[in-house]
Amino acid sequence: MKKRISLLLIICMVGSIVFFFPKENTQEVKTVKKKQTPEISFYHQEYKERYDTYQKAHQDLSKKEVITLVNMNRDFDFYGKIIKQEHPNDLNTIVNKYYQLDETYEPSDLVEINTNAGTYGSSYSKHTARKVIYDDFQALKQACINKGFELYVTSGYRSTAWQKEIYNHMVETYSVERADETCSRPGHSEHTTGLGLDIALDQYKYEEVENHPQYSWFLSQLSNYGFILRYPKDKEELTGYSYEAWHIRYVGKDLAQKIEKSGLTFDEYYARNY
């Protein structure tokens, strides 16, 4: 009997201990992840100090704008940092007030770009450009004819020596400051790549070309044939040049359409993608 009572007491004590001992909390603990700022794909760690310095000096700009401008080397004055362009033959090559071509560079595939004089273009018949442009330019020219007007090249490829003559003439006639607004220094001209063209429409010469009744249509068609307007209006601080309604640049259809869709200048697009 005593043994039975003792056994019951032990069972009760054990039960009490189990009952009063805290149960382990098995509820899953959910961790709240902080939302992270999307990474900027064109951020370069080696430029961090330059980004920080430029951001402090331009606090009104977004981080994305600062990174773009520093990638464009706009934290230096124009011609304040010279980078040798190592890939002058690529369609996406850039030549501007920072990127410079070797003084001996000359495309190996130059061809005459104006196939005939046309109604207004007798003085434009001997300009050359790279062969890679030819087919798309002729297709664009035919599209213009179908629309009722004629397209001509008024200036195509220029050697570095030729560009030097033009630039020096501008400096002597006006000033270095004025020359730099509208004319590239030797080695910095897109014309030397053989991919940049100055154009005219009908009797509207290059400086009057945007007054042509079909100019807006012409601009809207450029990317379909691989061209972009290289120096758009109100973008002088980005491109380094005054607005040039007549200067088009060949980059190929795919890239031209991407640049147009982005709404960026070629300089900005290049800084974000190459």
Would you name each region that the model predicts?
Residues 6, 14-155, 160-274:
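Extracytoplasmic cell-surface/polysaccharide-interacting catalytic and binding patches
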Residues 1-4:
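Positively charged n-region of N-terminal signal peptides that target proteins for export
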